[in-house]
């Protein structure tokens, strides 16, 4: 399959290309979709495991097309998403004498994409970045839209920049080597798109016999899942590139989810699992406060269960610290925490009128499981 989704922005337009076998044609895509020229330098940023699977295929294709290649390998995992890791990319960029016309190619999941994108945004005040996501989570979320950054000890993604890629190349074949837990976690973001934007996608997920493993998805469902999710992200980003308003809806489930991630030191739950927990919490909050029906909330809960995602939080998680952590969320305005709240399957609203006692009540219920 090959599907090209155009992203039209005021200052830079690009394509999201979904292509089976695309990694082996990387050089061609850089020339014809990213409009880069042979002879230019490309620094491939990855982690050792991903590079072991796909690095040679990418390098051979780039070299065959005439690009001057080099590599920078970083440790894998959210806890390495730091300025220290970005410094390693800077060191590689300096060693390879990257120029304004050079490109950083992010080959990996969301952590690699965020760090490589931030390095590209800040090296020489901005050079090209090409996003080549190899995880489902990065394919449907992190690689599209130009958000880049790293974590601060006090919160997730507090240091960053908007820096749009020259190209996003998604090769679904890389999902064959994705661990099952990572695949399931990414489904939280896919379900999110169904709740906030695309009711048709939500219904397709409901109709699927199983969602918990890559190999149980039909090729058609996988294609639908990728295309619908990417199109939803592109639709929102096109309307609001810098998160001035509408784009904030993409953070559904993230406000509480980021707090859970941070307070469990990014070790107990991965990002998608934490987002799923945030969706469970806000979904029930939306019922309690009259935003949507219990039936719609139950449909969301059932899909999250169908993806074999966690639905309860640890009994020993300090809820006072979790409530405090919400104040460091990027969506806080004038000291008020803004929540993305569902009003129907396929529609949400943004509100800062969520009483803290209501949040605590829902979280306590989630601890009882």
UniProtKB/Swiss-Prot annotation:
Cofactors required: Co(2+); Zn(2+); NAD(+)
Any one annotated GO CC term: cytoplasm
Cofactor note text: Binds 1 divalent metal cation per subunit. Can use either Co(2+) or Zn(2+).
Sorted UniProt keywords: Amino-acid biosynthesis, Aromatic amino acid biosynthesis, Cobalt, Cytoplasm, Lyase, Metal-binding, NAD, Nucleotide-binding, Zinc
Coiled-coil regions listed in the entry: none
Gene Ontology biological-process annotations: amino acid biosynthetic process; aromatic amino acid family biosynthetic process; chorismate biosynthetic process
Signal peptide: none
Localization (cell): Cytoplasm
Primary localization class, coarse: cytoplasm
EC nos: 4.2.3.4
Pathway entry: Metabolic intermediate biosynthesis; chorismate biosynthesis; chorismate from D-erythrose 4-phosphate and phosphoenolpyruvate: step 2/7
Keyword Cell inner membrane (UniProt): no
Catalysed reactions, semicolon-separated: 7-phospho-2-dehydro-3-deoxy-D-arabino-heptonate = 3-dehydroquinate + phosphate
Binding site for Zn(2+): 189, 254, 271
Binding site for NAD(+): 110-114, 134-135, 147, 156, 174-177
Entries under InterPro entries matching the protein: Dehydroquinate_synthase, DHQ_synth_AroB, DHQ_synth_fam, DHQS/DOIS_N, DHQS_C
MF term (GO), any: 3-dehydroquinate synthase activity
Function summary: Catalyzes the conversion of 3-deoxy-D-arabino-heptulosonate 7-phosphate (DAHP) to dehydroquinate (DHQ).
UniProt similarity note: Belongs to the sugar phosphate cyclases superfamily. Dehydroquinate synthase family.
Entry-linked NCBIfam families: aroB
Name by which UniProt lists this protein: 3-dehydroquinate synthase
Organism: Cyanothece sp. (strain PCC 7425 / ATCC 29141)
């Amino acid at each position: 399959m090959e599907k090209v989704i155009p992203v039209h922005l005021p200052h830079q337009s690009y394509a999201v290309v979904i292509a089976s076998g695309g990694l082996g044609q990387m050089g061609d895509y850089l020339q014809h979709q990213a409009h880069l020229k042979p002879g230019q330098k490309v620094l491939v940023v990855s982690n050792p495991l991903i590079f072991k699977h796909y690095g040679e295929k990418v390098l051979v294709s780039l070299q065959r097309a005439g690009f001057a290649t080099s590599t920078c390998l970083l440790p894998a995992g959210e806890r390495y998403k730091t300025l220290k890791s970005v410094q390693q990319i800077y060191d590689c960029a300096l060693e390879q004498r990257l120029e304004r016309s050079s490109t950083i190619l992010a080959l990996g999941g969301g952590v690699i994409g965020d760090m490589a994108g931030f390095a590209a945004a800040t090296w020489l005040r901005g050079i090209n970045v090409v996003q080549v996501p190899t995880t489902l989570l990065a394919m449907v979320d992190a690689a599209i839209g130009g958000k880049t950054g790293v974590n601060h000890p006090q919160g997730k993604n507090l240091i960053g920049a908007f820096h749009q890629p020259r190209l996003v190349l998604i090769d679904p074949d890389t999902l064959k080597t994705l661990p099952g837990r990572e695949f399931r976690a990414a489904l939280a973001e896919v379900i999110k798109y169904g709740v906030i934007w695309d009711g048709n996608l939500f219904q397709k997920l409901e109709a699927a016999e199983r969602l918990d493993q890559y190999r149980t998805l039909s090729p058609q469902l996988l294609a639908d899942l990728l295309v619908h999710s990417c199109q939803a992200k592109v639709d929102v980003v096109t309307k609001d590139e810098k998160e001035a308003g509408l784009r904030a809806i993409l953070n559904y489930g993230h406000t509480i989810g980021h707090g859970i991630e941070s307070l469990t030191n990014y070790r107990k739950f991965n990002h998608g699992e934490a987002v799923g927990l945030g969706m469970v919490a806000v979904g029930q909050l939306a019922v309690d406060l009259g935003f949507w029906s219990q039936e719609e909330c139950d449909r969301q809960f059932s899909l999250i269960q169908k993806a074999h995602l966690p639905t309860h939080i640890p009994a020993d998680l300090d809820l006072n610290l979790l409530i405090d952590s919400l104040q460091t969320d990027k969506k806080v305005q004038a000291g008020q925490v803004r929540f993305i709240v569902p009003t129907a399957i396929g529609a949400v609203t943004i509100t800062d009128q969520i009483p803290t006692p209501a949040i605590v009540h829902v979280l306590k219920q989630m601890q009882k499981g």
